[in-house]
A protein has these predicted regions:
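Short, high-confidence coil segments that cap the C-terminus of an alpha-helix
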Residues: 8, 59, 86-87, 160-161
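Short, conserved catalytic or adaptor-binding loops enriched in Gly and charged residues
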Residues: 28-32, 106-108, 155-157
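A short, conserved acidic/glycine-rich loop-to-beta-strand motif
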Residues: 85-95
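Residue-level signal for inorganic ion chemistry
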Residues: 22, 54, 68, 82, ...
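Catalytic-core segments of class I nucleotidyltransferases/pyrophosphorylases
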Residues: 63, 70, 76-83, 97-99, ...
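Conserved N-terminal catalytic core of the sugar/cofactor nucleotidyltransferase
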Residues: 1-67, 77, 144
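A structural signal for short hydrophobic beta-strand segments in well-ordered beta-sheet cores
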Residues: 104-107, 165
């Protein structure tokens, strides 16, 4: 439903385990304001490999996303930043904090301590599972075999294409684990969509 709010009306869904439950529930997508079509992975093809099963991609740009996410990402801003920066691909990112339980020393080239931080927390930008891609780059996906988003991003970089990150400023949660799914159910009434 969220995608259709941003004018994304043709959605392809890759199915595998218990996929018929999804297709039986959403059918052709008309109840949620879009046109849904389904492809079925006979064997696992990775997080991006199933794209090769889709026969007709008619748009110049493609959004790929993991299906086990709850987010209120602003897709319009995501697209505008992608265009403004002249990107070939954008990956939506989320901050991931890594607390270090000890003091961390920073050394110079002579191995003298030049500074230290007591129990710092480092923040990294992590893959948020949402990608905006120029259709022409889909040729980098092999026709057979498992191919993950990380493989694809490496192929994009190795090919000299422009890959940018887009920090998600709103809500994002991977609901693939039972505890996180329960959290999403508690949070959903308080999220601005």
């Amino acid at each position: 439903e969220r995608l259709s709010q941003f004018g994304i009306s043709n959605i392809h869904v890759a199915l595998r385990y218990l996929g018929e439950q999804i297709s039986d529930h959403y059918k052709d997508g008309s109840d949620i304001g879009c046109k849904l079509s389904y492809v079925t992975e006979v064997e696992p093809l990775g997080t991006i490999g199933a794209v090769k099963l889709i026969k007709n991609i008619n748009q110049e740009y493609v959004i790929l996303m993991n299906s086990d996410l709850l987010t209120n990402i602003d897709y319009e801003d995501f697209f505008n930043v992608f265009i403004e920066r002249g990107a070939d691909m954008a990956v939506a990112t989320i901050p991931y904090e890594v607390p270090i339980p000890y003091a961390v020393l920073e050394m110079n080239e002579d191995k003298f301590v030049k500074s230290f931080s007591e129990k710092p927390t480092y923040t990294y930008q992590s893959n948020g599972g949402i990608y905006l891609i120029k259709k022409s780059l889909l040729e980098l996906i092999p026709n057979q075999g498992k191919f993950d988003a990380t493989d694809f991003m490496n192929a994009v970089i190795d090919g000299g294409h422009k890959l940018i990150s887009y920090p998600i400023r709103g809500y994002w949660l991977d609901i693939g684990k039972h505890n996180d799914f329960e959290k999403a159910q508690r949070d959903i009434d308080h999220i601005q969509f």
